[in-house]
Amino acid sequence: MAATIDDEVHALAQRLWDFHTAPAAHSPPTPGEHDIILALGSHDLRVAEHAAHLWDAGAAPLIVLSGQRGRRTAGAHGHDRWPRPEAEEFAQTARATAGIPSTAMLLETHATNTAENFTHSRALTAAHGIAVTRAIVTAKPYMGQRALATATAHWPEARWTFHCFAGGYTDYPNADTPTEELVHFLVGDTQRLDVYARRRWSSPVDIPDDVWRAYELLVARGFTNHLVDNDTTSHPRPTGRSVP
């Protein structure tokens, strides 16, 4: 079934957006309160711009930019393959945004998924002798729930805060990510919270019944491009999952 956008889809997608962005901090971080800013690589360079603004405001002395290429930046679904790893593209954007010196950035160029963003960055900071007890993670706004769930599973000794660039569901789409693709991403990230927790790739997150119902209705409407294999029969449903 071809996915089409209408008022029902907008309402359902708005519910997913509100859920996924709920963990985002709305007040500016206190200068000097965090050890690092971890920017999760993706196709959205606004994340790198926001990380640069956080650094420029004194949120942390160091930015860790993490990412090789994901499905989108590797050329999936007809998109152009990025010539360089996401971390390198992010670094270029961060420099252009706030003039960040190379000494204030660490580039992690091997991660191909969110779990690896954290495990590889954790190893990289440790190799540089950097103790991380409080940290900011920034990513696409709708990755708030998944970013923190992954952080607590793979870098649990640090206390994490999620920050993202401003704007809501209707503000996020642009020429690079139209509304239809955003809805596919929202559906996929909702599924990942459930599936990845069962696979023990991330910590369990309580998904309210109305959020899960919105997800199911959007899947039925054809928004399935960002779904992953759901063969998790050998894994128990996480206790944090609210079953409809």
Language-model region placement:
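A structural signal for short, hydrophobic/glycine-enriched beta-strand patches
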Residues: M1-L186, R241-P244
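A conserved mid-domain beta-alpha-beta active-site/ligand-binding segment of alpha/beta enzyme cores
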Residues: A175-T232
